[in-house]
Amino acid sequence: MDFSAKIIDWYKKNKRDLPWRNTTNPYFVWLSEIILQQTRVNQGLSYFHSFKKEFPSLRKLASAEEDKILKVWEGLGYYSRARNMHFTAKYIIKNLGGNFPKKYEDLLTLKGVGPYTAAAIASFCFNEPKAVVDGNVMRVLSRFLGIYKPINSIEGQKDLNAAATILLNKRKSALHNQAIMEFGAIQCTPANPHCATCVLNTNCYAYANNKVKILPIKNKKKSIRTRYLNYFTIRYKNAIFLNKRLEKGIWKNLYELPLIESENQFDSDKELLKQIKTKFKTENILIVNKTPEITH
C-alpha cells in the first residue's frame, strides 16, 4: 500500500480551507504555527486574522510595542509565545536581514521554535523533505503501525519521528505533511475515530487488532500542585488599582488585580484581612464584598 498516496488523495477531498495553507510566506506560516501551539484551530483562526491585520509583515511585528502585541494576543494564554515571537521578529530583522532561515537546523536556532515548528516552516515554505510530527501525526502512526511506546516519552518520540521520516513522500513533503496532520485532526481523532470509512483501515494495526481505544499510549502527567490566588479589587473614586507583574513567569509584564498567593485556603475573613493589611501596610482596609471561589 502507498501510505502517502492514500492520505494525499483523502486530503484533497476532505481538507478544511485554512488561510495559512494558501501561502508559502514563512512569516504567515510561522505565525500560524505559534498561535496553534496549545490552541485549537477554531480558536486560533480569529487570532491569526487579527495578527495579520495588525502586523501584516515581520517588520511591522518587530517594530511594535510589546504591550500592543500582548493585547492582540489577549485570551490565548501562554503569553511567552507572544514574547518569543516578538523577540524572534526583532532578531530576524536585525541579524538576518529580515529573511527567515530556510533550513530546518537553522530554524531551530530561533527562540520559541522547536522541532515541530521548524519542520513545518522548512517543509511548507522551502520544500525541505522534513517530516512534521505533531500530536495528530503521532496518533495516526501509533495506531497504523502499532507503536506502544508512550508518545510523550523520549523513546516513543524517537520511534515516531523515524517512522514519519520513512513514510514521508520526499517529492511532495509539504503536501504529505499537511495531509497526515489533517487526517489525524478530522479522521483519526482521539475519541470516536471514523475507522469504518478510513482509507487506511485495511492495513491499520489498531483497527485489525481492536486497539484503537488503547493507542496511542501516553505517560500519566505528574501530580498538579494546588495554588490559592486571592485577588482584590481596590477602588478609589472612579479608578481601579492594577499591578504590573515584574517577576519571571508566564504572566510577566501583564497587568492584574492585587494578589496574595497562599499555600492554603484562608479559614476566615479575619485571617484574610490580616494578610491584606500586612501586604499593603495599612489598617484602613474594609472588605466590602467577596466573590465565589473559582477553580481553574
Predicted regions and their residues:
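Intrinsically disordered, low-complexity, charged terminal extensions of DNA damage-control enzymes
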Residues: 1-17, 22, 185-296
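Catalytic cores of DNA base-excision repair glycosylases
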Residues: 3-194, 200-209, 213, 280-281
